[in-house]
Amino acid sequence: MGMIIRTPKRIHLGLIDPTGSLGRRFGSLGVALEGGYEVKVLPAERLEVKAEGEDVETIKKAVERMNSAFGTGTGYLIEVRKAIPRHVGLGSTTQLSLAVGTAIARLNNLNVSIEKLAEVLGRGKNSGAGIYAFAYGGFVLDGGVKEGIPPLILHEEFPGEWAFLLVIPEVKPGLDEEEEKPIMSGNFGDVNVAMEISHRILLGLLPALKERNVRAFGEHLSAIQRLVGRHFAEFQGGEFREDVELILDWLGKKTYGAGQSSWGPTVYGLILKAEFQRLSAELNDHLKEHGIRAKVELGLPRNTGAEVVSENAFLERLIRSVGGS
């Protein structure tokens, strides 16, 4: 019997303190969205991977790491049925790695915490946002890296009537892990900026989330994103990537708050779900007018973590959904 895993994707709302001034580096926040990976994992005589591009190597590494840590073997048929685009800022590597690791753990009756699983799979070295989005969904905030995986500080349901206008322009991909390694391992950032980000999170963003105040949340989100951009300006040519600034300028004027997810190129604007059709039409006109090729999507919040079910249960649910018996 096999397992079916459906993950979220995540947008990254920023890193707090790269300086490590209080003994912990980074600290991250993010939101889980619908539309992640769907992966099927079956026991098999040998490893067979049905996936495209870099997903193949990510899967092989996950299988090897699980076997090295837990002796779970390498005999699996792993098929990626739906995927998150690579290197666009939506957390594909972490979601796929955790999906494969979770399935292998379940198939071998292993009870492993999400933190241990992430550590084994080499995830969470700089940010816990993707790990906790996978585990719990919703809005997540971690407490920064000291030793091991950054601890989860807050998990909060994200309002279902809120959404994100996602824009993925056809430009240079975001940095991959090897490209970002020398940056993230170096000394950079501004402690005063980190203090202002922290202030905005604690007394701005989080109260607005608790009170379901979309305007206040968006205002603080935009401010936090600009501040985070100051940490990374020397590496990306400014507070945001130059090739997304025109889109971000539009999002900043038309939505409640806007930002760049991780290294981009995905950018987003906070909206009400009911506003998507109107705003996406206006945005597509704007993109066409300026000759910008981009994919525009509705980013729906997902307030549950990855779904893991047996293949039989998955098929039964599918049959019921189409009116079968």
How would you describe each model-predicted region?
Residues 1-88, 105-114, 302-305, 309-325:
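ATP-binding N-lobe of GHMP and related small-molecule kinases
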Residues 2-6, 12-14, 20-28, 113-254, ...:
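ATP-dependent small-molecule kinase catalytic core of the GHMP/sugar-kinase superfamily
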Residues 8, 135, 260-265:
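Short Gly/Ser/Thr- and Asp/Glu-enriched loop/turn motifs at secondary-structure junctions
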Residues 32-33, 72, 252, 259-263:
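A structural signal for short secondary-structure junctions
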Residues 38-41, 255-260:
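Short, flexible, solvent-exposed loop/turn segments with mixed acidic/basic and small polar residues
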Residues 85, 99, 121-124:
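Glycine/small-residue-rich loop that forms an oxyanion/phosphate-binding "nest" at active or ligand-binding sites
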Residues 89-92, 96, 194, 257-263:
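Short glycine/threonine-rich catalytic loop with a Thr-x-Gly-x-Asp
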Residues 90-114, 133-144:
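DPxDG-like acidic metal-binding loop motif
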